[in-house]
Structures are given as C-alpha cells and as structure tokens.
C-alpha cells in the first residue's frame, strides 16, 4: 500500500507496561519489513484531585490524589498486508489502550 501510513496511539496508567507494549509492536512491524517511526513519547496527562480529609471541619487539612496517563505514538510507514495481519493478531496487556488510525 504505497503512500499510506498507520498511526498507533497507546495510552496507559503504567509507563513500564506502555513501553513494553510499544516495543512489542515495533518488533512485530520490523519483522514484516515495514518502516517504523517511534515510539514517540507524548506529554503525560496529569489530573490532580484535592479532597477534604474531614467531612465536617478542618478545611486546611486536605488530601491530594493524582492520575497520570502516559502516551506513546508509533507511525508505520509503507505497511504491507502482512503488517496489518500481524497487528491484528498482537496480544497486548489489559491496561493498555490502543487507538489505530489509517
């Protein structure tokens, strides 16, 4: 498929799991002789939640919780039908969200 590119966005709370998944995708794509760009680390999305510790008073005493979403981007240039079949069969961990754009 000349001139086509596949863009894969990976999201996860655990950066180690995300890096392992990205490495696995890159290895599989390289086995099918397609060009790979990435994994490119995207900015981490950080959400902070501030909650009062006491339900009644002590407004100065608060707890802070944060949620971090790590992201990676992989571009596959000049994919072949073998590449697409290999990507469909890949088995990734449950904590990784995969978004594929053709």
From Swiss-Prot:
InterPro entries, sorted: Ribosomal_uS10, Ribosomal_uS10_CS, Ribosomal_uS10_dom, Ribosomal_uS10_dom_sf
Pfam families (UniProt xref): Ribosomal_S10
SUPFAM superfamilies (UniProt xref): Ribosomal protein S10
Keyword Ribonucleoprotein: yes
Keywords: Ribonucleoprotein, Ribosomal protein
GO biological process: translation
A GO term from the CC aspect: ribosome
GO molecular function: structural constituent of ribosome; tRNA binding
Organism domain of life: Bacteria
Keyword Ribosomal protein belongs to the record: yes
Record's function text: Involved in the binding of tRNA to the ribosomes.
Protein family (similarity comment): Belongs to the universal ribosomal protein uS10 family.
PANTHER family membership: 30S RIBOSOMAL PROTEIN S10 FAMILY MEMBER
HAMAP family given in the database record: Ribosomal_uS10
Subunit composition and interactions: Part of the 30S ribosomal subunit.
Full protein name: Small ribosomal subunit protein uS10
Native source organism of the sequence: Thermosipho africanus (strain TCF52B)
